[in-house]
Amino acid sequence: MSPGRDFVRAIRDALQPAKAENGRAAREHDSFFESRDAISRFLFVQDDPAPVDLCFVLGCSTPSNMDPAIELFRKGWTPKILISGYGRGHTELPEHELFRRYALERSVPKSALLIEPEATNTLENFTFSKAVIESELGWERIKRVALVTKPFHMRRALMTARGQWPDHLELIALPAKVPGEPLADTWWHNEDGRRYVFAELRAIGAYGLAKNLGRV
């Protein structure tokens, strides 16, 4: 049985406290919750909203991921929103177009939107957008950036930004909370949540081995 499946089974067993009847079982039970909570603290990062020079939104198949960026704009806390991503063909339209239309329908003016139309993965989101920011805004004008992505994806987004973007930036994590998406306090409750989280941990490992990440 694979390590991933072993861990899933350990999760299921640990969620049944009646099995922790002796000292060893109790220690294993406690160890599971410590591991689960450590994973949650590592992956799921969230800051308080604050004024920024740019809001950067990573595309996906769920356009309501735009909501934190739209809220920042409505408050006057960001002058520009950069949407990045073509996607992987899981949507009828490119992800950037889905997000652009979603924002326009919610009264964000076209002049406030920047588009990076080609990225198909997280690394490309940041490497391709780096040139867009330089040409459209200039990095010297950007000091603080809000990152918007799925909650379980935020750690990799932050670390990739640190590895690919200028060192002087202050980064703010604003995860988009969409119904049904894994959250820090629920991801282990179902197979989809566990699958997303384990896949994200593997992806962070792969990005780290490829030297694509920076320290957060």
Describe these PLM feature segments.
Residues 2-189, 193-194:
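A structural signal for short, hydrophobic/glycine-enriched beta-strand patches
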Residues 182-216:
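A structured, mid-to-C-terminal "fold-capping" secondary-structure block
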